[in-house]
């Protein structure tokens, strides 16, 4: 699908005086606006309220039309705070949906829902913009070939591989390495696939958004010296913003990603943190618009809203958008309508484990809880599938034996089980990997491990060829040859100490 970009400015900041209306009612972030007969705006059109507040400060509030009420009135939802607005203020219909800048000019910059830069680094080139509301690619444009999206991260590629153009749910609490994993994926897609990334911060903490930006600058994902060489564009609509902004910021990020896919023909990574906040914002807007709530108080249009976002995230014949979405599960209830609706769209889940993080095994991806629809022999091949299954079986058996080991000790196990435990511990450590973006913290150079190398390494451990090597040799290394070399170094060091 090709975009037909407009050449107007981003958001709704530059306007002609066309089709003016008047504010007739304000209820929080919801505005009712009256227009002259025969000049009603379309649904999703951007409106701008312009004027001055009681102390003479200029007001410029963007809204989006949600309902046509009759009697020449529309109901719109504000994208920014409505403090200072009064009845009778002039409202301008822009005649089009919210449009945001797209293309290379967005890389290394932070935007709000309207596509306006919020990082104090000056204006952005707005010669090419695109509306945030678009239809999903037509069937004929889709790339239906099932292919693996190689990340260079062993535990992901082997046990829960990502689909090119697929959607992945990322589950993890605070402090288990979610941000570092996200940054490594951004780094690897740029190096291995020549792709770029778009990060959509939907309804999360402003502090976390700031921390992510600072860490990206520190790790080189955002290049301060030459912004154009950055690998990511950031779009934030944080939890202090009105529900309208939080509901639409995901679409703004997606629109930027679509341009890289359709026009630049690149592989794009789209991060959404957090997809639950998108649903939550939609629920707030639905209540403000007076719709009858559905199950558990959610909006009746929940599935439609989720589908309209998720169906645009796909592979076309030009390129792909692979989406990684952090999923918050309210009260750990997986049957809650918000996560349940999200699960229907996911191709893989990556679960981060606090237990593994406590052991110092990073990335702390749980190899048994993480799943993928791609892990089938006809897609990944027999060799990959068999290796992954044997790794999972070994780790599952080790998990079952841990209670016995804790009570009776390793000596009480059979010879066969002792061997299995030793191999499982090697596998657990070999699933750790030094990251490029964590070099500044760990001092270990980052490693990108190809899928073939990953499979070969785990096959050697499972076959017993490396039973004689110490388990610490497998910790934080790249491929299996590095583990062998590390074992030799450890042996030499221990001999020198003697």
Curated annotation (Swiss-Prot):
Q: Give me the disulphide-bonded residues.
A: none
Keyword set for this entry? Answer: ATP synthesis, ATP-binding, CF(1), Chloroplast, Hydrogen ion transport, Ion transport, Membrane, Nucleotide-binding, Plastid, Thylakoid, Translocase, Transport
> How would you describe this protein's topology in the membrane?
Peripheral membrane protein
- What cellular-component terms does GO give this entry? chloroplast thylakoid membrane; proton-transporting ATP synthase complex
Enumerate the catalysed reactions.
Answer: ATP + H2O + 4 H(+)(in) = ADP + phosphate + 5 H(+)(out)
What's the EC number here?
7.1.2.2
Per the record, the domain of life is Eukaryota
Q: Per its UniProt record, what Pfam families does this chain match?
A: ATP-synt_ab, ATP-synt_ab_N, ATP-synt_VA_C
* InterPro entries, per database record: AAA+_ATPase (IPR003593), ATP-synt_VA_C (IPR055190), ATP_synth_F1_bsu (IPR005722), ATPase_a/bsu_AS (IPR020003), ATPase_alpha/beta_chains (IPR050053), ATPase_F1/V1/A1_a/bsu_N (IPR004100), ATPase_F1/V1/A1_a/bsu_N_sf (IPR036121), ATPase_F1/V1/A1_a/bsu_nucl-bd (IPR000194)
Q: Keyword check for Membrane, yes or no.
A: yes
Q: Where in the cell is it found?
A: Plastid, Chloroplast thylakoid membrane
* Keyword hit for Nucleus: no
Q: What is its main location?
A: plastid
So where does ATP get bound?
A: 172-179
GO MF entry, a single one: ATP hydrolysis activity
* Family of the protein in this entry: Belongs to the ATPase alpha/beta chains family.
Q: What does this protein do?
A: Produces ATP from ADP in the presence of a proton gradient across the membrane. The catalytic sites are hosted primarily by the beta subunits.
Query: What is the protein's quaternary organization?
Result: F-type ATPases have 2 components, CF(1) - the catalytic core - and CF(0) - the membrane proton channel. CF(1) has five subunits: alpha(3), beta(3), gamma(1), delta(1), epsilon(1). CF(0) has four main subunits: a(1), b(1), b'(1) and c(9-12).
Q: What name does UniProt use for this protein?
A: ATP synthase subunit beta, chloroplastic
Q: Which organism is it from?
A: Nicotiana tabacum (Common tobacco)
From the UniProt record, report the name of the gene that encodes this protein. Answer: atpB
